[in-house]
C-alpha cells in the first residue's frame, strides 16, 4: 500500500509564517503594545509568530528586538517538514497459502493453511495472522453422512500509541516545526499544545520539560494485541427413510483476546495520564501498562427434518421443519498499573498526591470487569413445490426468541412466500422467442425481524466506585442509570415485497437481472431524550417506521468471443428511495439538525441553511430566509427556524459497480469499479485549535460564526487560500469570511445574523458523488504444455493496482470517506498461484 500524499493544498512554512505575521499585525500588535503598560489588556497569541513577537516561552530573549525576531522567523522558513513522509510509509504485506485435499468414496478431507504478514502504513505498525481450516466428510454407510470441520486462527498486532492522533497531526501540524534537533534528539513541537497555554490557560496546561514530540510518542509507546479464535462443528445427515432426512448441527466457537498498552514515562501521553495532583507536576513522572483480557464463547445447536419426494414426473415436494438454539457469553477483565518496568514486569503505585479520597477513587477505577450473556431460540419450517421445470412455489415460517426483550415481546413470528416461473422452460415461449436462452419471472413477499443489540429493556445501573450513601448502620454503593428501562421494547420488523425478471439472450452472451423491491421497516428502535423530572436522560423504544423501495439491474455481456480473444463487461445499477413514514419521539420541539429521523423525509436527511454568499458589509456568511419566515425585530434574523431548508441526504440514492475483462491467450486484464451518485456530506474537519482552547475570564466575547472566522483556528496549519478573505478593504469576490477575535466584543453579530451551527454548517456541504476504479488486475497463466513439464496442474502470476483513479467534483481528500485527514489507501500487490 502506498502512503497518502498531502493533496489538500496546505500552506508551506514560508506561507504559514507570513500568514501568522499578517494576523499578528492586524489583531495583536497594537494590543500587545498597550499591554506593556496596562496588564488588563488581552491580546491574541496565534502561531509561533505570535509567541516570538510577544517574547513568550523560549523566546523571552527576543522580546522587544524586532530585528532578531525577524531573523529567527526567517530561519524557520528553512524548515518545511512533511509530516506525512515522517509518520507514514509504504505498507508491505505478504500472504502464503497452502491447501490439500483428497479421499475416497467413504471419506474426503480438505486442509488449508495460511500465513499473512503485514507492515502497516503507520510507522512501527505490524500485523501477523496464522490460520488453519480443515474439513472431513465421512460416509460409513449409505444412510449416514458426517461432516466435521475446524477453523482456528491467531492474530498478533503491534501499533504505536499516542494520545494525539497521528493522522490529524500530519494534516494540521505546522510545517515549520522540526522533527529532530541538530544533535539528533527529538525536537519539541512549539505550537501543537501552546494555544491555550499562551491565551489564558497557562496554569491549567502545564507541559513536560521535554515538550511534546509525536515521534517520541510513536517510538516509545505501543499497544500489542493477541487474538486466538476457533470454531468446531459437526453435522450429521441421516436418511431415516428414502424421502425423509434428519440433519443435525452442533457448533462451538471461542475467542480469547489480550491487549497490552505500554506508555513510557518520558512521553506526553504518560504526562497527561497521572494520578491525583501529579498532572500539574513536571517532575513526578511515571509510565503505565494497561491490560485487557476478553474471553468469548458461543454455541449453536440446530436440527431439522427434511422431506423430499417426487410424485409422478411433474410434482416434487420439499418440506423442512426444525429448531435452533444459540447463545454467547463474554467476560472482560481490565487493569492498569503504574511505574511499569518492561524489563522486569514490576509495577508500583505512585505516592498519594492531592486529596486522599479523590486519589483512592482514581485508583479503584484502574481495575474492573464486564460480562454479557445472550440467548436465542428459533423454530422454523419451509415448503417448496416444483411443477416440472417451470413453476416453483415456496413458503417459510419461523419464530425467534431473544433475551434482549421483555418477556411479553421475546418471540417474533415471521413468514415469507414466493413463486418463480421459468419462462425459458416453456416450449411455446422458446419457439416465439428463439433468441432467448433463459428467462425467469419471480416474486416474493414476507416478514423478517431484527434485534438492535445496542439497546436493552432492562434497568441497567452503572456503579460509581468509592462513592457511597450511608443510612443508619448500612452502606449503599451509589450508581447511575443512563437510560430508562422499557419492558415493552421489542423486535424491529421488516415487511419485504420483491418482483424480478432474469433473462439471457443469444446463448447467454447477454444476461439481464432486474428486481424491484418494497421494504417497510416498522418498530425501528430509536433513543429519545426525556424530561429530566423522570430521573432519566433518554429511553430506547420502538418509535419509527421507514419505507425503502427501489430497483436493481445487473447486465452481463460477452462482447467478443474468438479463438484467442475474449472481452466481457458487467454493470450493476441500483436506485433506492427511502422515507420516514412515522417517528414519534417522547418529546419533540421541531426539526433540528440532530434529528436522526424526520417524518416525511429520507433517513440521513440534511436540514441546514441555503448559503447565499458573504455579506459585503459585515464579512459574515449569509443565508436565504424561508418564505414563511416571520421577521418582526432584528433579533428574528438570528433564529435558525427562519433559515432551515431540506438540502438532500447523506445516503446516495444511486449506487452501483462495473467490471470490464479482456483476455488474449494466457494474458488477462480486469478492471472493476464502483460509483455513488446523489449524496451530500459536510466537509467539516474538526480543527484541533479554536477559541474553545483559550480562556480569558471576565472578558466580553463575540460569537464566532464558523471556524473560518475563528482567529485562533489559524494557530495550526490551514489551506493556502485562507488568505483570500473578507477585509474592510477587500469586501467582494472573496472565498472566506472575515476573521475576528472571539475576545474582541464590539460587533454584536449574534443579534442580527444566523449563528446556530446547524444553519452555518451549510457552508461545508459538498456533493460527494464519485466514480472510482477500485482495481486493475493483470494475470498471466503459463500454457498447459509448460505446466505439465513442471509437473504442476497450473501456474499463474498476477499484479493488481487498487484505488488509483477517482473521478469526482468533490474537492476534499476522499469522497468515499468525506472529512477524512487520511484517504482510502492506494496499493499495488502481486501474487503467484501454484496448483499441484
Language-model segments: residues:
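Conserved small-residue
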Residues: 1-74, 333-341, 541, 558-650, ...
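Membrane-proximal, glycine/serine-rich, low-complexity loop/turn segments characteristic
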Residues: 1-230, 235-237, 306, 316-317, ...
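C-terminal beta-signal and adjacent terminal beta-strands/loops
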Residues: 4-8, 86-87, 434, 661-759, ...
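Extracellular/periplasmic, surface-exposed regions of secreted and cell-surface proteins
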Residues: 63, 129-130, 135-144, 149-154, ...
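Short Pro/Gly-enriched beta-strand edge/turn motifs at strand-loop
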Residues: 76-83, 365, 639-642
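Aromatic- and acidic-residue-enriched carbohydrate-binding clefts of CAZyme catalytic domains
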Residues: 272-284
Amino acid at each position: 500500500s502506498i502512503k497518502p500524499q498531502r493533496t489538500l493544498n496546505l500552506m508551506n512554512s514560508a506561507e504559514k509564517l507570513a500568514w501568522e505575521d499578517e494576523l499578528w499585525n492586524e489583531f495583536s500588535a497594537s494590543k500587545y503594545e498597550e499591554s506593556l503598560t496596562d496588564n488588563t489588556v488581552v491580546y491574541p497569541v496565534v502561531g509561533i509568530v505570535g509567541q516570538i513577537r510577544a517574547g513568550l516561552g523560549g523566546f523571552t530573549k527576543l522580546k522587544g528586538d524586532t530585528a532578531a525576531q525577524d531573523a529567527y522567523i526567517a530561519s524557520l522558513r528553512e524548515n518545511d517538514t512533511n509530516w506525512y513522509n515522517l509518520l507514514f510509509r509504504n505498507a508491505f504485506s505478504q500472504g502464503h497459502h497452502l491447501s490439500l485435499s483428497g479421499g475416497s468414496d467413504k471419506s474426503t478431507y480438505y486442509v488449508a493453511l495460511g500465513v499473512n504478514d503485514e507492515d502497516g502504513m503507520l510507522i512501527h505498525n505490524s500485523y501477523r495472522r496464522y490460520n488453519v481450516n480443515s474439513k472431513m466428510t465421512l460416509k460409513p454407510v449409505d444412510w449416514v453422512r458426517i461432516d466435521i470441520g475446524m477453523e482456528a486462527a491467531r492474530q498478533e498486532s503491534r501499533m504505536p500509541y499516542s494520545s494525539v492522533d497521528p493522522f490529524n497531526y500530519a494534516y494540521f501540524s505546522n510545517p515549520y516545526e522540526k522533527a529532530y534537533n541538530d544533535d539528533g534528539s527529538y525536537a519539541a513541537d512549539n505550537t501543537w499544545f501552546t494555544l491555550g497555554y499562551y491565551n489564558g490557560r497557562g496554569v491549567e496546561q502545564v507541559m513536560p520539560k521535554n515538550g511534546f514530540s509525536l515521534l517520541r510518542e510513536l517510538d516509545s509507546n505501543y499497544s500489542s494485541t493477541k487474538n486466538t479464535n476457533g470454531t468446531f462443528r459437526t453435522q450429521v445427515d441421516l436418511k431415516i427413510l428414502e424421502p425423509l432426512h434428519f440433519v443435525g448441527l452442533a457448533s462451538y466457537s471461542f475467542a480469547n483476546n489480550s491487549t497490552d498498552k505500554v506508555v513510557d514515562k518520558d512521553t506526553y501521553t504518560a504526562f497527561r495520564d497521572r494520578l491525583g495532583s501529579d498532572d500539574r507536576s513536571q517532575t513526578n513522572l511515571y509510565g503505565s501498562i494497561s491490560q485487557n483480557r476478553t474471553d468469548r464463547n458461543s454455541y449453536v445447536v440446530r436440527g431439522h427434518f427434511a422431506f423430499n419426494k417426487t410424485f409422478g414426473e411433474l410434482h416434487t415436494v420439499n418440506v423442512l421443519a426444525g429448531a435452533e438454539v444459540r447463545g454467547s457469553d463474554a467476560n472482560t477483565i481490565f487493569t492498569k498499573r503504574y511505574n511499569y518496568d518492561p524489563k522486569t514486569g514490576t509495577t508500583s503505585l505512585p505516592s498519594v498526591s492531592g486529596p486522599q479520597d479523590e486519589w483512592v477513587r482514581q485508583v479503584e477505577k484502574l481495575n474492573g470487569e464486564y460480562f454479557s450473556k445472550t440467548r436465542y431460540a428459533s423454530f422454523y419450517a419451509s415448503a417448496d413445490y416444483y411443477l416440472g421445470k417451470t413453476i416453483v412455489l415456496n413458503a417459510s415460517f419461523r419464530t425467534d426468541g431473544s433475551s434482549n426483550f421483555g418477556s411479553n415481546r421475546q418471540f417474533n413470528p415471521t413468514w415469507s412466500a414466493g413463486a418463480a416461473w421459468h419462462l425459458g422452460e416453456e416450449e411455446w415461449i422458446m419457439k416465439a422467442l428463439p433468441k432467448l436462452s433463459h428467462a425467469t419471472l419471480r416474486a416474493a413477499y414476507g416478514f423478517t425481524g431484527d434485534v438492535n443489540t445496542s439497546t436493552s429493556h432492562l434497568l441497567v445501573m452503572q456503579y460509581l466506585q468509592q462513592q457511597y450513601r450511608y443510612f443508619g448502620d448500612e452502606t449503599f454503593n451509589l450508581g447511575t442509570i443512563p437510560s430508562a428501562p422499557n419492558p415493552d421494547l421489542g423486535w424491529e420488523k421488516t415487511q419485504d415485497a420483491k418482483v424480478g425478471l432474469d433473462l439471457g439472450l443469444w446463448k447467454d452472451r447477454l444476461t439481464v437481472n432486474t428486481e424491484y423491491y418494497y421494504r417497510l421497516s416498522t418498530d425501528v428502535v430509536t433513543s429519545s431524550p426525556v424530561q429530566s423530572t423522570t430521573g432519566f436522560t433518554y429511553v430506547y423504544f420502538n418509535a419509527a417506521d421507514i419505507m425503502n423501495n427501489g430497483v436493481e439491474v445487473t447486465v452481463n455481456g460477452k462482447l467478443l468471443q474468438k479463438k484467442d480473444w475474449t472481452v466481457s463487461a458487467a454493470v450493476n445499477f441500483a436506485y433506492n428511495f427511502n422515507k420516514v413514514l412515522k417517528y414519534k419521539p417522547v418529546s419533540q420541539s421541531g426539526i433540528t439538525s440532530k434529528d436522526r429521523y424526520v417524518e416525511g423525509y429520507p433517513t440521513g436527511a440534511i436540514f441546514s441553511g441555503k448559503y447565499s454568499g458573504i455579506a459585503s458589509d459585515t464579512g459574515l456568511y449569509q443565508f436565504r430566509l424561508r418564505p414563511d419566515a416571520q421577521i418582526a425585530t432584528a433579533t428574528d434574523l438570528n433564529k435558525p427556524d427562519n433559515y432551515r431548508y431540506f438540502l438532500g441526504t447523506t445516503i446516495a440514492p444511486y449506487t452501483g459497480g462495473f467490471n470490464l475483462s479482456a483476455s488474449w491467450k494466457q494474458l488477462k486484464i480486469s478492471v472493476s469499479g464502483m460509483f455513488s451518485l446523489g449524496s451530500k456530506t459536510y466537509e467539516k474537519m474538526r480543527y484541533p485549535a479554536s477559541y474553545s482552547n483559550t480562556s480569558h475570564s471576565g472578558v466580553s466575547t463575540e460569537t464566532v460564526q464558523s471556524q473560518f472566522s475563528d482567529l485562533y483556528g489559524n494557530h495550526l496549519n490551514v489551506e493556502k487560500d485562507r488568505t483570500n478573505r473578507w477585509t474592510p478593504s477587500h469586501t467582494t469576490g472573496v472565498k472566506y469570511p472575515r476573521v475576528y477575535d472571539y475576545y474582541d466584543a464590539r460587533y454584536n453579530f449574534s443579534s442580527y445574523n444566523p449563528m446556530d451551527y446547524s444553519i452555518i454548517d451549510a457552508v461545508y456541504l459538498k456533493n460527494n458523488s464519485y466514480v472510482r476504479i477500485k482495481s486493475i488486475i493483470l494475470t498471466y497463466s503459463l500454457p498447459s504444455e509448460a505446466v505439465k513439464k513442471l509437473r504442476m496442474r497450473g501456474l499463474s502470476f498476477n499484479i493488481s493496482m487498487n484505488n488509483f483513479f477517482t473521478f469526482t467534483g468533490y474537492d476534499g481528500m476522499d469522497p468515499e470517506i468525506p472529512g477524512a485527514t487520511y484517504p482510502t489507501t492506494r496499493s499495488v500487490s502481486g501474487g503467484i498461484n501454484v496448483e499441484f
